[in-house]
Amino acid sequence: MDSQRTLLVLLLALVSFLLFQQWQVAKNPAPQAVEQAQTSSTLPAPSFADELDPAPAQQASAKLITVTTDVLTLSIDTVGGDVVAADLNQYSAELNSANAFELLRDTQGHQFIAQSGLVGPQGIDLSSNNRPSYQVSADSFTLADDQNELRIPMTYQANGLEYTKTFILKRGSYAIDVEFDVINKSGNNATLGMYAHLRQNLMDAGGSITMPTYRGGAYSTEDTRYKKYSFEDMQDRNLSLTLTNGQGWAAMIQHYFAAAWIPRNEPGANLYTRVIGNMGDIGVRMPNKTVADGDSAHFTATLWAGPKLQDQMAEVAPNLDLVVDYGWLWFIAKPLHWLLSVIQSFVGNWGVAIICLTFIVRGAMYPLTKAQYTSMAKMRMLQPKLQAMRERIGDDRQRMSQEMMELYKKEKVNPLGGCLPLILQMPIFIALYWALMESVELRHSPFILWIHDLSAQDPYFILPLLMGGSMFLIQKMSPTTVTDPMQQKIMTFMPVMFTFFFLWFPSGLVLYWLVSNIVTLIQQSLIYKALEKKGLHTK
């Protein structure tokens, strides 16, 4: 019994520490800016990098055009046709703020933009100081109520070639198709290819002091479904991977939101990263195409700029939904998230959905919980016999072990019976933690009364204090034979430690743990009453 309680304490402490540590340092640590010469001398850049000007864009903007749909508001620079701002219209910057969340922006001290262009012998984006200045028919474009698709063509002519860059946005979608059409009237062959990358400051920290998260790169290939590539990785070496079948993507991700470039039908495309000063690029370079005189060529890629909505992202590209990172227990967390979403669609409140999900999960695990408490009760009933055995045998460990096993066999008690159910439950608890932690749906979602945002900490710490109190009640209800003073101090300190950890946890997670503790109290009462009737428990 003592060993089981000790294991319980250690498991809870370990899980709490690991979750808290992961939550605190999941973000990419702010890296130090590096000189370009150091980067280039350490590892050679991908072969195509020589085509691009090594300096960040310095050319003054000719004009910014505004593109508005029901879910996005974009600012596109007519110089180069870069997306220099992306506001998510249905997500506020802060709770109760009228300002939309800015995913992409190009401001003093912060740059996160989506660039795309044409490189190669006849490319027009080889130099960041001499990029094409596109012509466009209007300063703003808005998706009308009777429209499902909005197209923004931008044109440019040089050296006998006609270039058209078109942005295509659809109602309700965060996926933006970017197409290049090139008509060759130069009298000679023209060779060029498309590139598309995301550029971001390497010094940007992820999240805030109370909600630090990962901010950095990620990619997918035919061989690697999903892999993070942090800013530190980019500084260590330039990424260069070939998409043999053209299936993959490159992304910059952060908590709840992501931007990604996805090539379309481009076997041989190259995923790459490069670091220039304190700026990091991650993107894709499509193979060159040779366009004969009088002929034309078409290039296309898709830009995702929006929240981490798994269903929509899975439709845009294979494995893009994996940016919702549930960790190694994804196969448990993903069904739990699906079930949570289904419940919310009925009850209409994410906090109530968390409560319902907790009751469902704990109810499903009730047989394991009952087996755990029953085994612990049987072990507790054997304590007098085990103590007498220790006094009789003394320090002969081998004999003590043999007689203990004989006693367990005679009494039909499994000494690990109380530990195994607990160990089996832990992955479910951890998976549910990540399902709640990664759900953008909880962002700015209210519960009741003072809880206005389930993704933020409880402003008055009421839920963490209630959670700590529920842990204290569980301890008081649980029989113990622990006599070691150190173990007693550890067990007494556990509710205090948990309460401290949970003070800064998102209130949705604290709500889950509080409700889980309440369910534990209910289940304990029911199980102990049943054990009393069997003579295995006394008040």
From Swiss-Prot:
Quaternary structure and interacting proteins, as annotated: Interacts with the Sec translocase complex via SecD. Specifically interacts with transmembrane segments of nascent integral membrane proteins during membrane integration.
Molecular function via GO: membrane insertase activity
Protein name: Membrane protein insertase YidC
Residue spans crossing the bilayer: 6-26, 341-361, 416-436, 454-474, 495-515
Gene Ontology, cellular component aspect: plasma membrane
InterPro entries: Membr_insert_YidC, Membr_insert_YidC_N, YidC/ALB3/OXA1/COX18, YidC/Oxa/ALB_C, YidC_ALB_C, YidC_periplasmic_sf
Gene3D superfamilies: 2.70.98.90
UniProt membrane topology term: Multi-pass membrane protein
Family: Belongs to the OXA1/ALB3/YidC family. Type 1 subfamily.
Function: Required for the insertion and/or proper folding and/or complex formation of integral membrane proteins into the membrane. Involved in integration of membrane proteins that insert both dependently and independently of the Sec translocase complex, as well as at least some lipoproteins. Aids folding of multispanning membrane proteins.
Main location: membrane
The keyword Transmembrane belongs to this UniProt entry's keyword annotation: yes
Keywords of this entry: Cell inner membrane, Cell membrane, Chaperone, Membrane, Protein transport, Transmembrane, Transmembrane helix, Transport
Biological processes per GO annotation: protein insertion into membrane; protein transport
Cell compartment(s), UniProt: Cell inner membrane
